[in-house]
Regions:
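Conserved acidic
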Residues: 1-212
């Protein structure tokens, strides 16, 4: 018998986001008769570095660089036999219509396995191409948390090379890196001048406020 599952969904609204302010999350942890999709699925191993080590490396060198893997989970296809487990109801916000049944073709935000699978693909490509992209391979292994990249290097020139390598290795893995932010010495000096006027960019790195 083929198992079928309909995943409930809910919106997560983040008004502070510069790109996608509303994200649809599929609740794979919702229980039916005491079980949920996530409780039965294999979540995979932890393959990314721990948060504390990443933050320490991020603060280590003079120039910091931040990037974001755009829609990381949606770059991975769900296998044909697993698609009935990724069903959901949708009526395009029209409450007069009966919901229709769809199947997700890509990995969903909310599945316990999504992070491991995405990180495995990302790290596998980095390892396969580490001879050609040594800087990027090191970043993917030690300075990547979920879909965020946050390395630091000694010089602006090294930052440019690292960004280029990460972009190229991302293309090989099917990932697009966006929202690049770099903290150069020039930016640091400008920040000190503008402290009183509050005219400096502010972002968050793993929940920690970072004044660029």
């Amino acid at each position: 018998m083929k198992i079928r599952e309909k995943l409930p969904d809910f919106p997560v609204v983040r008004a502070d986001r510069t790109t996608t302010k509303t994200r649809i999350v599929f609740d794979a942890s919702a229980k039916f008769r005491g079980k949920s999709f996530n409780s039965e699925a294999l979540s995979g191993l932890k393959v990314q570095a721990d948060m504390f080590s990443i933050l320490v490396r991020f603060r280590k060198e003079l120039v910091a660089l931040v990037g974001d893997l755009s829609q990381m989970y949606h770059q991975l296809f769900v296998t044909l036999e697993d698609r009935p487990l990724h069903r959901f109801l949708w009526r395009n916000l029209d409450q007069s219509k009966e919901p229709e049944v769809y199947e997700f073709l890509r990995y969903v935000f909310g599945g316990c396995y999504s992070l491991f699978c995405a990180q495995y693909v990302w790290q596998k490509h980095a390892d396969d191409h580490k001879a050609e992209y040594s800087l990027a391979a090191e970043v993917v292994k030690n300075s990547c948390y979920m879909d965020d990249l946050m390395p630091s290097v000694e010089t602006v020139e090294a930052t440019k090379e690292m960004r280029q390598q990460l972009t190229e290795i991302g293309h090989k893995a099917g990932f697009h890196i966006r929202k690049w932010i770099a903290q150069t010495p020039e930016a640091v000096r400008a920040t000190k001048v503008d402290l009183e006027r509050r005219e400096f960019p502010v972002t968050k790195i793993l929940g920690v406020v970072w004044i660029v």
